[in-house]
Amino acid sequence: ETDGEQEMTRAFVFPGQGSQAVGMGGDLLATFPIARETLEEIDDALGRNLTKLIASGPPEELTLTENAQPALMAISMAVLRVIETEGNIDLSASCTFVAGHSLGEYSALAAARSLGLADTARLLNTRGQAMQKAVPVGEGGMAALLGAEMDVAQEIADEAAQGEVCSPANDNAPGQIVLSGAMSAI
């Protein structure tokens, strides 16, 4: 407490893969120079024009893991820098914590200044490429089961597998379990 008033707790939480969309951050990039500068810094670190892919796609390219991961982090960092610049605040100093869902943990590390922006971009580029190589495009998939408990999710996965890989991959939240495996089983 400060002078009889309760001090506010701040957190910044970053999204995981799957929330990407062509044109994301477009208004932000058109309005705030710091947002454009952030993406230019990431483009330079990667040696490619990720900004153009984010702005105009095509969607099937943006959704590839090797592109989606650095793209989501890029927009997350652009949002963060706009908030810091326009609000004249340093979120890394004024937040109680930062967090992220899955991929968003990397954005949280960059927001906390535990990783530099260029290093985070390169790390996610490499991570995304490795994940993309692990499963050829169109062969693997994921599906969220809503309202299922783990034992029911396991039964559904076992029945769906029919000789293919299909299993619970992530206990996302109470009532949401993600199955992953061969697309034919999903």
Give, region by region, the residue ranges found by the protein language model.
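A broad detector of short, well-ordered amphipathic alpha-helices
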Residues: 40-41, 74-78, 105, 118, ...
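Short, glycine/charge-rich beta-strand/loop segments that flank catalytic centers
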Residues: 59-60, 96-99, 103, 128, ...
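Hydrophobic side chains within alpha-helical segments
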Residues: 72, 79, 108-110, 130
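Short, Lys/Arg-enriched N-terminal segments with co-localized hydrophobic residues
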Residues: 1-7
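Alpha/beta catalytic cores of group-transfer enzymes, especially the acyltransferase/condensing modules
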Residues: 17-19, 111-186
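Long, contiguous hydrophobic alpha-helical segments, chiefly transmembrane helices and signal peptides
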Residues: 73, 101, 168-171
